[in-house]
Amino acid sequence: MVVGIAHYLTVSAVLFTLGVFGIFLNRKNVIVILMSVELILLAVNINFVAFSAALGDLVGQVFALFVLTVAAAEAAIGLAILVVFFRNRGSIAVEDVNMMKG
């Protein structure tokens, strides 16, 4: 059995769907929303790599590497902001984050 591009696209679609459901079904926890965004970015990266391998072009794989770098920085900055916000307010609920001034 050969693993083709359809298998990779199926896995990517499942991960993308899980990420979208995670965002829409959980509106209270910011950490779960950040993890759902990371799932969506992972699904996009799988698409880039799958099409890059199928077409024999390395541009998609390089772009996926850049997306992974930006996603790691986004996760680190987002979690750092949440830690500071939790220390100041004692909660990381979305309702509390929406009440911020500035």
Curated annotation (Swiss-Prot):
It is a multi-pass membrane protein. It comes from the Bacteria. One of its GO terms (biological process) is ATP synthesis coupled electron transport. Its EC number is 7.1.1.-. Gene3D superfamilies: 1.10.287.3510. It is an enzyme of class 7 (translocase). InterPro entries: NADH_UbQ_OxRdtase_chain4L/K (IPR001133), NUOK/Mnh_C1-like (IPR039428). It is found in: Cell inner membrane. NDH-1 is composed of 14 different subunits. Subunits NuoA, H, J, K, L, M, N constitute the membrane sector of the complex. It catalyses: a quinone + NADH + 5 H(+)(in) = a quinol + NAD(+) + 4 H(+)(out). The chain crosses the membrane at residues 5-25, 31-51, 66-86. NDH-1 shuttles electrons from NADH, via FMN and iron-sulfur (Fe-S) centers, to quinones in the respiratory chain. The immediate electron acceptor for the enzyme in this species is believed to be ubiquinone. Couples the redox reaction to proton translocation (for every two electrons transferred, four hydrogen ions are translocated across the cytoplasmic membrane), and thus conserves the redox energy in a proton gradient. Belongs to the complex I subunit 4L family. GO terms for molecular function: NADH:ubiquinone reductase (non-electrogenic) activity; quinone binding. It comes from Mesorhizobium japonicum (strain LMG 29417 / CECT 9101 / MAFF 303099) (Mesorhizobium loti (strain MAFF 303099)). Keywords: Cell inner membrane, Cell membrane, Membrane, NAD, Quinone, Translocase, Transmembrane, Transmembrane helix, Transport, Ubiquinone. This is NADH-quinone oxidoreductase subunit K. Pfam families: Oxidored_q2. HAMAP family: NDH1_NuoK. GO terms for cellular component: NADH dehydrogenase complex; plasma membrane.
